[in-house]
């Protein structure tokens, strides 16, 4: 949130001679300073001022309004001065670690210290009613984004040492951090609100709002208007009598604003059809009775719309369109001080042209006298020309731009004409009727200031050097300005006076030329005190008001007449009432239907003046119960509301309800108590691709009527027709009337989608295709014809696109045809495309939210050597769109970018593959594989996953067709040193691997192995078996088969002997659609799979469908035969449908598979290929995709009508089992003793109770709590590098291997070395005590003992750099060691949770939704171009589409929430990553 703060311009000096004042001129004193100055400020209601020297950080104080200055002793190296807004005697001077506070305007200072420097953003939080209660925020640690820091507090004004409030916070503030908030109420005096890290995650999507009344000994998460807590909190601010917080859901830039007037009841702010986006709104200076927000109209233009809330801060209506903004978020908007209802704004006149082509803005100034409800031109006396003034986006002085508390006196620099010109072409204008009429005061631009309640106006030339200061005693009328001549020329930097504008003394900060060259800095003190006598009663107008009726009487503004006692403009006197602000009196007016009312939320204005009406907006829903049955009319609001804060008396017809005909509104559909279905037919032979554009439920959590808009699906048929539905497939319409060859949903922003044609034209929507939001742009070239990925997206900058086009490719077979990459930073808009690199195969943005600190502009590309298509590839990098480039590797086969790692495969001269990994995009280290691992050439890699601070890598051992298998090896925390996890793992010809991680739980994975590898090496057919791990690959076991099948019959083998009789399930290599997963991120602990019980995996024809609800420890057979499945309402519904044969029904379970019910969706059978729902599995709707004879069909099945889902589920984190949920803890099946321990702790998850008749709907944080940490056991460790696991589970040195001296790393530049150990703790484990004594200790290298002690003595700061190894040292990339408080050697890890101590149990990135199967394939075997493409094309019917795997972007939209945790791009490594148009 950006705020208009008074701009404090730099200023400085040491002492210089003063100029004696003449009787007819003000007293002038000049003080010179050696250095440039900053932070020139007054203490309110006094003549005491402070200023700071920039170069040395010294602070100077004046007790006489700048006449004389003295340096404050013992205060130096100051970074910032901050005054209390609520105590005009208090201020804090912030140094690097030592700080000072005063309670007597700087006469005396007390010091206090913090461990680290203050935050540059908001270092101090003042309490509005207790000046001794203060928060101090330390600088945030941003090395591993996102930025988190520590906050201290004091309750005695730092008389005692400040105490730590909270460690990992984004921001904190007092509840009573604004004068108007809880004003006069005797409660919440010690209440503090903080936005902190997530419960078990450092990722910004998990940030929480916490409230505490006892300085965070205890804290609670407030429930928002939906009755639930909300994660993803990004910002917070106090605005008059409101506190506003903003939250951002994952995978979306859209924000939700929540407001409160007491921190107990929170409201979700509603903006009608408009979206609020991150970094795209400014909370303006608001009123005591409403919040005013300026919202950007587009991410790419500095222009907005201004909205004003009702008195509760919940419903916002649009007041001003096309407001002018700048890139810093400042808005040309100012309320005229002390005058109610008067607002000055600048608007963009040529907004259409500016929005479309970015041509220069043409600005107009407008003024409102009714708080922004209506606006009029600024007029100059005696002229017809409009006046336009420079405003907040072009500041030239500190404080307010136009006004001060001096009643009705307003000044500004601008020009007359059609539009606002340059500042230097402007003149100074003045108004003494609050902007109603203006006249030119002085020609040329001037800085200006108000004194003595407007009796004195001072101005100084602002376009260069001058030796004059101008002043007026007659409200700035044109001929009333007099000159003060200086003996030297100055360049004015700042002109200021007391904030209340009651003083006759002014200060000017300026610079002047020095003898011998250069400039010196001066503060000039001006005192007008003795120039005029004090005013008498006859000199005042006792009832001055802003506007007057035609009869000369004051007019009504905001429901009353606001009257001031003001000096007459021509009175020859000074008021001299210093430090007393002018106070108005009020006379109430009767309510007027035109003047005192505006359109209510959900209604749009139509017409002007007396003809103005408020008509229901398109997005407005009917009131509950309206137009049901045969009703012809319904009662509704009038559409009008009294303007918030309006004080008029009486009532009018505007406040009465009206009757509206039902014909004006869409009839409510009849409510059903049954499951419903809608079947839609399409022309075509295949569904080419389909994607869900899911709007995060949090964004609309308390607007259930809009739920239908949340479930948008886009789909493409092989007829090249793109379709779209917003209600999960009940009604479909064509997305665009054009031939579409590909759909690209944005990988990181669910609202964005792109429809590609075979030409340069690209259709796109930034709002999921809603509200006629589909537009088009011209790409720089046609799409490439090399079957490469055409579009790439930036994880953080949603409008940054990479386009992979083809040049000279219009003719088929043209030898000059080649690929070219382009960048747009404005979502493809006109003239925004810049060429990057030609002859490329792939270009990718490298930035990620966590763990990789690189420039947002950094891009990696694979480019053909010497710019020849088909030549060997090289990996190149740039952070300026390839104006300069760096070659990272030559002979590159492929590279993959994942959450924490970038992995690059290169081919050596002998044909072997080498793998290098990096964490930061610049320092690479070659992967060290288990010694003696390869007796043959390294032929192919598949990068499987990197979500648990380690890379899982499949290395192919046998690459022969139909005989492929390999080993899964697992890396250390920097991706360089690997140990064996599981051997003989099945792979197919395309590089896909039978490996899948469970969604929602870390460390659980399933794989299929080839049981007869020796026979397979001799050409025999594979015999496959399934294995499961519950400790992140450290140990694998067969799947426990159920005792009986679904017909209650025993199996033919002994299920107690798992080695000979276990469950085997079909894996990733056999799926038509890789988006189909065993598990769901929101149905925690549940998996479904197709397979059989026996000694090995058999065919699909012999398979049954199985289910587990305890993360794979036990399984049950639920149906004979092969079924496809989906989870709904976070596991509350499980729907299955027969796959591969004609059917007219589905089965569903509402009790985790205990009982299955049949629902018939059609009168005749259709062939179903897939069943899908929204990626988060939170919906009550499903879609079946299939064929009906020669036509394609999509069937919506809607469970929302069932009585089981009428009520919203209740969840209470404080009493988790009291409502509709139980607590469930995952277990390790082989754990000795404490079975509830998994990864060294007992985790508790929310799971809906069986039989609870309610809908969960809005996504909940399933992780409830880490109940406790467990004592370490063997299960918390895996074998270290150079060691292998023996059948008994112990780790021993690989036979015949000579271990290097661990101290050798010291000779290569390292500062520390470790004892060798056969074990390493699994990075996920948080176990404590009984740590295995084999764990190696850390030692200092010779010469670094002192640094070692100093570093390892650090404590308290959440993250610190512990050691950086050169990348050759021990194969390290440069990694960080996170240490626990007791100095015990902890795990070495990087990434999102690396910022927390092990003792914090910061292990969970919930839910784990990394790409589970194949993520990246590298192969050295040449592929015949097109063979894979043909293979994939045959599978398009499943929605997998012709695209090989844009990974999350493709399949996050269909199955499982791959977006949730790891921004794994998951490219296929190898020439399989092709794209065709």
UniProtKB/Swiss-Prot annotation:
Signal sequence bounds: 1-21
Main location (coarse class): Golgi
Lumenal side: 22-1356, 1427-1477
Keyword Transmembrane helix in record: yes
Subcellular location as annotated: Golgi apparatus, trans-Golgi network membrane; Prevacuolar compartment membrane
One Gene Ontology cellular component: Golgi apparatus
Disordered: region residues: 645-672, 1019-1050
Highest taxon, organism lineage: Eukaryota
Pfam families hit by this protein: Sortilin-Vps10, Sortilin_C
One BP annotation, GO: Golgi to endosome transport
This protein's record includes keyword Protein biosynthesis: no
Keywords from the UniProt entry: Glycoprotein, Golgi apparatus, Membrane, Protein transport, Receptor, Repeat, Signal, Transmembrane, Transmembrane helix, Transport
Cytoplasmic side: 1378-1405
Family annotation (InterPro entries): Sialidase_sf, Sortilin_C, Sortilin_N, VPS10, VPS10-sortilin, WD40/YVTN_repeat-like_dom_sf
Glycosylation: residue positions: 288, 974, 1018, 1269
Coiled coil regions in record: none
Its job: Functions as a sorting receptor in the Golgi compartment required for the intracellular sorting and delivery of soluble vacuolar proteins, like carboxypeptidase Y (CPY) and proteinase A. Executes multiple rounds of sorting by cycling between the late Golgi and a prevacuolar endosome-like compartment.
Family: Belongs to the VPS10-related sortilin family.
PANTHER family on file: SORTILIN RELATED (PTHR12106), SORTILIN-RELATED RECEPTOR (PTHR12106:SF27)
UniProt protein name: Vacuolar protein sorting/targeting protein 10
Organism expressing this protein natively: Leptosphaeria maculans (strain JN3 / isolate v23.1.3 / race Av1-4-5-6-7-8)
Gene name of this polypeptide: VPS10
């Amino acid at each position: 949130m950006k705020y208009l703060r008074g701009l404090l311009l730099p200023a400085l000096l040491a002492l210089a001679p003063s100029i004696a004042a003449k009787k007819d001129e003000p007293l002038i004193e000049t003080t010179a300073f050696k250095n440039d100055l900053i932070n020139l400020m007054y203490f309110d209601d006094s003549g005491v001022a402070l200023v700071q020297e920039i170069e040395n950080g010294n602070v100077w104080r004046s007790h006489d309004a700048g006449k004389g200055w003295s340096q404050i002793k013992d205060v130096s190296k100051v970074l910032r001065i901050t005054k209390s807004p609520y105590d005009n005697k208090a201020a804090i001077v912030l140094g690097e670690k030592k700080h000072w506070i005063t309670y007597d305007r700087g006469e005396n200072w007390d010091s206090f210290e913090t461990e680290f420097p203050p935050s540059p953003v908001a270092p101090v939080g003042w309490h509005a009613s207790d000046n001794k209660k203060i928060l101090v925020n330390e600088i945030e640690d941003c090395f591993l984004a996102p930025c988190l820091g520590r906050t201290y507090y004091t309750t005695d004004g730092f008389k005692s040492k400040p105490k730590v409030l909270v460690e990992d916070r984004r921001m904190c503030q007092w509840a009573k951090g604004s004068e108007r908030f809880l004003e006069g109420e005797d409660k919440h005096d010690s209440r503090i609100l903080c936005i902190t890290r997530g419960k078990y995650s450092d990722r910004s999507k998990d940030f929480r709002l916490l409230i505490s009344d006892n300085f965070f000994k205890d804290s609670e998460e407030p429930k928002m208007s939906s009755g639930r807590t909300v994660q993803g909190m990004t910002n917070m601010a106090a605005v008059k009598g409101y506190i506003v917080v903003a939250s951002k859901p994952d995978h979306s830039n859209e924000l939700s604003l929540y407001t409160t007037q007491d921190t107990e009841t929170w409201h979700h702010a509603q903006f009608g059809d408009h979206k609020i986006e991150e970094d795209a709104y400014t909370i303006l200076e608001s009123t005591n009775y409403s919040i005013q927000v300026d919202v950007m109209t587009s991410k790419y233009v500095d222009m907005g719309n201004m909205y004003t809330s009702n008195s509760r801060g919940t419903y916002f209506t649009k007041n001003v369109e096309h407001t002018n903004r700048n890139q810093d978020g400042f808005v040309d908007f100012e309320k005229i001080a002390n005058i109610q209802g008067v607002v000055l704004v600048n608007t963009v006149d040529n907004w259409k042209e500016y929005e479309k082509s970015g041509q220069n803005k043409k600005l107009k100034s407008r003024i409102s006298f009714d708080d922004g409800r209506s606006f009029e031109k600024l007029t100059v006396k005696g002229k017809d020309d409009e006046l336009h003034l420079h405003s907040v986006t072009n500041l030239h002085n500190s404080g307010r731009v136009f006004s001060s508390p001096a009643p009705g006196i307003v000044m500004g620099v601008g020009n007359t004409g059609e539009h606002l010109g340059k500042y230097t072409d402007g003149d100074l204008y003045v108004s003494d009727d609050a902007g109603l009429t203006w006249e030119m005061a002085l020609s040329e631009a001037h800085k200006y200031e108000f004194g003595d309640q407007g009796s004195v106006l001072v101005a100084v030339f602002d376009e260069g050097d001058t030796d004059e200061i101008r002043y007026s005693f007659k409200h700035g009328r044109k001929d009333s300005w007099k000159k003060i001549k200086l003996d030297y020329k100055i360049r004015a930097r700042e002109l200021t006076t007391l904030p209340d504008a009651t003083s006759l003394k002014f200060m000017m900060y300026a610079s002047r030329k020095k003898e011998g060259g250069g400039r010196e800095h001066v503060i000039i003190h001006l005192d007008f005190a003795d120039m005029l006598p004090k005013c008498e009663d006859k000199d005042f107008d006792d009832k001055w008001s802003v506007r007057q009726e035609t009869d000369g009487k004051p007019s009504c503004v905001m429901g009353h007449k606001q009257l001031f006692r003001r000096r007459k403009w021509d009175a020859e006197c000074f008021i001299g009432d210093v430090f007393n602000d002018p106070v108005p009196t009020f006379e109430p007016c009767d309510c007027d239907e035109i003047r005192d009312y505006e359109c209510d939320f959900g209604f749009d204005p139509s017409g002007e003046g007396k003809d103005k009406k408020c008509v229901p907006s398109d997005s407005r829903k009917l009131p509950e119960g309206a137009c049901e049955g045969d009703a012809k009319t319904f009662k509704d609001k009038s559409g009008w509301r009294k303007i918030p804060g309006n004080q008029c008396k009486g009532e009018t017809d505007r406040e009465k309800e009206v009757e509206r005909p039902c014909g004006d509104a869409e009839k409510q559909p009849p409510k059903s108590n049954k499951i419903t279905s809608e079947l839609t037919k399409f022309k075509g032979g295949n569904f080419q691709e389909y994607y869900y554009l899911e709007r995060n439920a949090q964004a609309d959590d308390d607007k259930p009527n809009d739920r239908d808009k949340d479930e948008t699906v886009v789909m493409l048929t092989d007829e090249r027709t793109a379709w779209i539905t917003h209600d999960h497939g009940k009604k479909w319409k064509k997305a665009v009337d054009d031939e579409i060859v590909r759909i690209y949903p944005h990988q990181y922003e669910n609202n964005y989608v792109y429809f590609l044609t075979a030409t340069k034209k690209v259709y796109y929507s930034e709002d999921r295709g809603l509200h006629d939001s589909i537009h088009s742009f011209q790409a720089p070239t046609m799409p490439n014809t090399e079957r490469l990925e055409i579009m790439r997206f930036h994880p953080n900058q949603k409008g940054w696109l990479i386009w992979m086009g083809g040049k000279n490719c219009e003719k088929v077979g043209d030898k000059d045809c080649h690929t070219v990459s382009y960048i747009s930073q404005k979502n493809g808009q006109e003239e925004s495309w810049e060429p990057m690199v030609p002859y490329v195969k792939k270009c990718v943005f490298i930035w990620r939210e966590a763990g990789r600190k690189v420039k947002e502009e950094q891009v990696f590309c694979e480019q053909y050597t010497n710019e020849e298509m088909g030549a060997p590839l090289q990996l190149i990098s740039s952070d300026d769109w390839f104006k300069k480039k760096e070659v990272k590797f030559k002979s590159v086969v492929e590279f993959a970018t994942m959450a924490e790692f970038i992995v690059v495969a290169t081919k050596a001269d002998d044909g072997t593959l080498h793998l290098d990994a990096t964490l930061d995009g610049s320092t690479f280290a070659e992967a060290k594989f288990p010694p003696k691992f390869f007796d043959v050439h390294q032929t192919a890699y598949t990068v499987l996953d990197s979500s648990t601070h380690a890379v899982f890598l499949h290395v192919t051992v046998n690459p022969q067709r139909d005989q492929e298998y390999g080993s899964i090896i697992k890396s250390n925390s920097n991706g360089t040193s690997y140990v064996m996890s599981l051997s003989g793992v099945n792979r197919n010809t395309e590089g896909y691997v039978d490996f899948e991680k469970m969604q929602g739980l870390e460390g659980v994975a399933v794989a299929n192995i080839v049981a007869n590898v020796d026979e397979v090496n001799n050409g025999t057919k594979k015999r496959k078996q399934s294995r499961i791990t519950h400790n992140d690959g450290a140990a694998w076991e067969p799947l426990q088969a159920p005792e009986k099948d679904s017909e209650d019959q025993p199996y033919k083998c002994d299920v107690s002997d798992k080695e000979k009789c276990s469950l085997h399930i079909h894996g990733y290599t056999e799926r038509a659609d890789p988006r189909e997963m065993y598990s769901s991120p929101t149905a925690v602990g549940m998996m479904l799979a197709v397979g059989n019980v026996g000694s090995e995996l058999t065919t699909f024809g012999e398979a049954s469908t199985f289910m587990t609800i305890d993360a794979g420890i036990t399984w049950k057979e639920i149906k004979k035969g092969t079924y496809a499945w989906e989870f709904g309402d976070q596991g509350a519904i499980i729907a299955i449908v027969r796959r591969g044969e004609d059917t007219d029904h589905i089965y569903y379970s509402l009790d985790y598979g205990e009982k299955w019910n049949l629902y018939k969706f059609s009168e005749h059978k259709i062939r179903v290929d897939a069943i899908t729902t929204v990626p988060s599995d939170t919906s009550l709707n499903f879609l079946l995709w299939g064929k009906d004879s020669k036509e394609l069909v999509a069937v919506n099945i809607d469970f929302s009508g069932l009585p089981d889902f009428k009520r919203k589920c209740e969840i209470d984190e404080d009493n988790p089992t009291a409502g509709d949920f139980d607590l469930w803890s995952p277990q390790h099946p082989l754990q000795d003793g404490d079975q509830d321990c998994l990864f060294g702790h007992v985790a508790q998850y929310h799971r809906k109770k069986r039989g609870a008749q309610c809908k969960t709907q809005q996504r909940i944080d399933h992780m409830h709590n880490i109940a406790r940490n467990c004592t370490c056991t063997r299960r918390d460790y895996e074998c270290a590098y150079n060691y292998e696991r023996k059948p008994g589970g112990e780790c021993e040195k690989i036979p015949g291997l000579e271990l290097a001296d661990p101290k050798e790393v010291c000779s290569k530049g390292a500062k520390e070395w470790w004892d060798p150990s056969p074990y390493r703790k699994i990075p996920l484990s948080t176990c404590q005590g009984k740590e295995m004594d084999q764990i190696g200790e850390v030692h200092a290298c010779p010469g670094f003992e002192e640094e070692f002690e100093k570093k390892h003595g650090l404590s308290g700061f959440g993250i610190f750099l512990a050691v950086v190894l050169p990348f050759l040292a021990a194969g390290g990339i440069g990694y960080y060691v996170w240490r626990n408080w007791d100095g015990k050697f902890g795990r070495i890890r990087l990434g999102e949770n690396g910022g927390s101590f092990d003792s914090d149990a910061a292990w969970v990135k919930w839910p784990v939704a990394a790409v589970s199967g194949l993520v990246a394939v590298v192969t050295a075997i040449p592929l015949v171009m097109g063979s894979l493409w043909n293979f994939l094309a045959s599978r398009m019917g499943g929605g997998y589409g012709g695209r090989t795997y844009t990974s999350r972007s493709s399949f996050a939209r269909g199955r499982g929430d791959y977006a949730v945790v790891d921004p794994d791009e998951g490219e296929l490594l190898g020439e399989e990553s092709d794209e065709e148009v």
